[in-house]
């Protein structure tokens, strides 16, 4: 049992306080899932790319005496690899010791960047986009929003999720939303249970797709990425998902200028 929410302002102009609105909606859904909360929000595109990534899980901070040194080493390796690929970091923010936001300039293949960075042990890219910012962590919406400073996020639309873990671990990796890697600005949230997860996951992995968790919801994001990589537009891919996915489900998907629902 989880909660999902979405909002879009088609005539937002310079944007509205999407962060505050999403937090209000997700906090109202706290009873549907107290384990973790996630946001996929869309701000103004200034021509740069936003990379949201983590170098550890929140629980890791309590699990190892060496974790702070490990986190430092991982972050230094990420920075080195970005430099090696010619990625110019113009702004860095670290809302937590393990979660980071980089604003970058890069005109090359962002999939190559994502793969090279995620090759670092313990590192996961949560999202890449010109307007998408994906934030998720343990706790309810008020906790996550305050931790990441989301209450004044200005944008046009967003989707979010409150999670009650039933099929996978309680950690950031298993929290929603999921980025539709490697497509910039595409994210998914889901409520329900997919009964053909493992069969379809193995098929997609054989096709070269990667999964970062054991959460069945990630299958939706990977499937949409697969279909769009083969030329489908978002609406066509979503219609195909109705037959492809087995189980009881409802999901929301957002792009830089669209918000859709399938069930």
Stretches with model-predicted labels:
Residues 1-263:
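Conserved short alpha-helical segments that host acidic/polar catalytic motifs at enzyme active sites
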